[in-house]
């Protein structure tokens, strides 16, 4: 049972900072931001230290590729935030605004058709950071997928980018065999050899 009594304004303020009240307790979870899910070994250690020092020792990963430190008492929230900021990280990712940008590993994945890390980092700077104080009617989610395999589900976001392969036709190499390799590998049957 929770014995903590917070005003609605204080709850809203904390949520806007990235602190979410843990159901039935006086504790909070804090969302530590990542840029497209990438964190360094030093950041991992700092997050683990923060979880053990301020929370209940548990880290969870969100669908927006942020890391939640759970079980932080209300009276330790400010100290926790200072610790995280001193480690070069930030908390946030909640509220009616642009949410943290998610990305697949298309930059390094064998199926990646674009540099998903670079694109999502640019979008993060321009929209997550650039529009950080802009109040929206609802949360706005952005995802960058490196290929049509859809691992990060860009089509389920408010704005999704999906890498595509564009076949290049070189007429001078075509022998007119009517066994086009593009047609043979198109899983949707969208590419067809035609006399037109």
Write out the residue ranges for each language-model feature:
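Iron-sulfur cluster-binding cysteine motifs and their immediate structural context
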Residues: 179-196
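Small-residue-enriched alpha-helical segments and adjacent helix-cap loops
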Residues: 4-6, 30-168, 173-176
């Amino acid at each position: 049972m929770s014995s903590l009594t917070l005003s609605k304004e204080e709850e809203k303020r904390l949520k806007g900072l990235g602190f979410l009240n843990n159901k039935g307790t006086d504790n909070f979870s804090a969302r530590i931001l990542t840029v497209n899910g990438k964190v360094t070994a030093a950041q991992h250690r700092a997050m683990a230290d923060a979880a053990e020092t301020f929370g209940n020792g548990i880290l969870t990963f969100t669908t927006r590729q942020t890391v939640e430190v759970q079980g932080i008492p209300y009276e330790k929230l400010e100290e926790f935030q200072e610790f995280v900021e001193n480690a070069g990280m930030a908390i946030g990712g909640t509220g009616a605004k642009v949410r943290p940008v998610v990305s697949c590993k298309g930059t390094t994945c064998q199926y990646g058709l674009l540099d998903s890390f670079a694109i999502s980092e640019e979008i993060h700077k321009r929209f997550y950071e650039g529009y950080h104080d802009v109040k929206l009617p609802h949360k706005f989610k952005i995802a960058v997928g490196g290929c049509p395999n859809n691992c990060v589900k860009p089509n389920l976001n408010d704005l999704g980018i999906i890498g595509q392969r564009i076949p290049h036709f070189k007429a001078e190499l075509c022998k007119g065999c009517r066994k086009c390799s593009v047609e043979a590998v198109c899983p949707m049957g969208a590419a067809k050899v035609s006399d037109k």
